[in-house]
Structure formats: structure tokens, C-alpha cells
Amino acid sequence: MAILTLGVNHTTAPVSIRERLAFPAEQLQSALRDLIDLPQVGEAAILSTCNRTEVYCELDGRDQRPIVDWMCDQRQFDDQDISQYLYSHFDAGTIRHMFRVACGLDSMILGEPQILGQMKTAYQAAREAGTVGKILTKLFHRTFAAAKKVRTDTAIGCSPVSVAFAAIRLAQRIFDDLGDLTAILVGAGETIELTARHLTENRIGHLIIANRTFDRAHTLANQFGGFAISLEELPKHLAKADIIVASTGSPLPILGKGSFESALRSRRHKPMFIVDLAVPRDIEPEVEQLQDVYLYTVDDLQHTVEENLKTRQEAALQAEEIIDLEVEHFLSWLRAQAATETIRDVRRQAELHRDAALQRALRELRRGKSAEDTLRWLADTLTNKIIHAPSSQIWQAGVNERADIVAAARELFQLKDPDT
């Protein structure tokens, strides 16, 4: 048995690769079922965010090739096109990696909290698909507990640092004052909600939220004093936008070059600041060719987030120490599973001997045999049944000069050293 992580993230693959490897929410269930159908896979979960796609599997063996082939087939990749971007971890490496990811230590912005919620969503999706069992369920729960401990015991999450926060910081560098500006947020998930909060805290003039589900946009707009529209209405409102932040789960771009050309004419080429946080992208890359447009993707934000690293280095070191302990705790549990199964089998075998002997003893009592004789027979029978197999194995170990087995048996049965 092995536990595998296989995936890509913002450090190993550009956005053009990550967007092709992303699994939209509506495709997760079928993808998980296809994955669990592989004969090598016992349990599986998929984490798919803007910055990473990772597959977690409990495998029979350590061959990751079937998982790579499955990923290529799912996302229409040739092996040579994807292998250079993939990373993998096994067992302790997987445990440590998942703990670090959940704590935000592997994120574009060190310590960002959103990833923990995304991992919980990934686990819930796998539960609903019926693809997680004892091992991954325990691992996810320990991952969540480790992340909680890190955030409680260190300062890793004290300041509001996230991709959304970095986007607003970038906007503040381009515009002196947000108070006279209009921002359109496309989507209504956690990233957009966080962006809306940061914009409101920085006193944005007007806020418009566009979403495929109007009710969700309306709820979010009410929360932050904004105005809700549907995605169908977005093109006619585009000219109002000084700032656009997009983060949906759409498999195809929502806004193209033509929409922005029209908006810029209406704005008389007043600049537009656009941040596309979605993977796959919500905004066609060709929009960047337009004058008076400042288009940034999640990859571009890397330069901004580097400024946040210095203040979190000490907290990150403390977090790594906590993770070291948590990894060892989980490994201890994992190592104990083989012993647990053996203990269960030994107990089951002993109970079978007990039940058989007890039934015979009860029959003898009903036939009038004395209780004392029956109890003596029962005690002798149980003793012989229980020690027969280990006694035979110990004797055979002596014949084969396996002193290690004999010594292990003395330790197992807590026998005193014969020389003392």
C-alpha cells in the first residue's frame, strides 16, 4: 500500500498548462469515479484550484504510471507534454505535502487561508463520490487538524494576505484613489467574496458583481453594498469598469477581445485594470494586446506576493516544526494499521476457538457432566487451542535456527529471560 500525490502547481506549470489540467466542479464526480475504477487505486480525491491540480490516491504498489496515463486521458494531454510539469510524492512525502498545502506554506502567497477551504471542498466531493476510505479520510482529517494548529499557534495567518489581496494592492499602485472608481467582480466564490471585502475596506466607489447564478450575485452585492447583474448583462456594463476581477469555474473564457474593444471606445480609452484569477482563464489572453488595458493573471501576481514573504518567514519556520510532529503522528498511526489488522485476526481466531469449546461444554453440562470436570476440560481445551499454532511455529523456528523468531516470541508473550 502507498499514498500518492500527483499534480502541478504555480511553481511547476504556467497558467496555460494549469487551466487545461483543471477539473471544473461539475466534472469532479465523474473524474473521481473513473479514477477509482483503475485496478491499482483503492481511494482517491482531487484538489483543483487556480494554482494547483493534485490527485491523492491510496495505491496498491508504487507505480504512478497508471495515474499519469489517466490524467493525460482525462485532460487530453500527450505524456511528453505533461510529464515535465508534474511532481509526485509518496507516503511521508504525501502526508507532509498535504499538511503544507493546507497550511498555506505551498501557496503563491505564503499562509493564505483559502486553500484550507478548498481542500475541505475536495474531500467533501470525494466523500460524495464514495472514493475515500479509511486511509484518505484519516489523512484529510489530520490535515485539517494540522492546519488549525498551525494557524492557532503561529502568526502565519495574522495579516489578510491572499491572491485577492495582492490584486487590490496592485490596483492601488495603478490608481491613486479607489473612491472614484467602479469595480466589476465576475463570479461569486470565495476569491470574489474576499476581493469584494478588500475593495470595500479600501473604499471602492462602486461595486458590481456579475455571476451565472443571479441570486448568489445578489446576496454578495447586498453584503458589500454593491449592485448585482447576470453574466448575460456583463457586456453592456463593461464600459463602467475601471477595475475587473474575474474568478469563475467556467471551462471557457467569458470575456473576449471584442467586448473590451467596444468598452474602451465607450470609455474614450480610459484605462482598465483587469485581474484574471481563474484557471481556466475567464478572459481571453488576446485582451492584453489592447492599449489602455492592464491585464494580469495569477502568474503575474507572483511579483506582488514576494513582498509579503519577509513578514511570514518566522511563522513559516514555526509551522514547519509543527508539521514535522504531525507527520510523525500520522505515520505512527499508518504503521499501526498492519498491526491492528493482525490483532483483529488473532482475536477473531481466539473467539472461534472459544465459541466452539463453550458450545461443547454447555452440551456436556446439559448431559449431566459435573461442572468441575467440564470447567477443567474447557480450560485445557482453550489453552491447547490458543497456544498450539504459536508453539508449532516457535518449535519450527528452533529447528531452522531462527533465533530472531524465538526471541520475538519471548518478547511478544512477555516471558522472562531463561538465563535470569
Curated annotation (Swiss-Prot):
Site, Important for activity: residue positions: H97
Pathway the protein contributes to: Porphyrin-containing compound metabolism; protoporphyrin-IX biosynthesis; 5-aminolevulinate from L-glutamyl-tRNA(Glu): step 1/2
UniProt-annotated binding residues for substrate: T49, C50, N51, R52, S107, E112, P113, Q114, Q118
Alphabetical list of CDD domains matching this protein: NAD_bind_Glutamyl_tRNA_reduct
Active-site residues, record numbering mapped to chain: C50
Subunit structure: Homodimer.
Annotated protein name in UniProt: Glutamyl-tRNA reductase
Organism of provenance: Methylococcus capsulatus (strain ATCC 33009 / NCIMB 11132 / Bath)
Taxon lineage: Bacteria, Pseudomonadati, Pseudomonadota, Gammaproteobacteria, Methylococcales
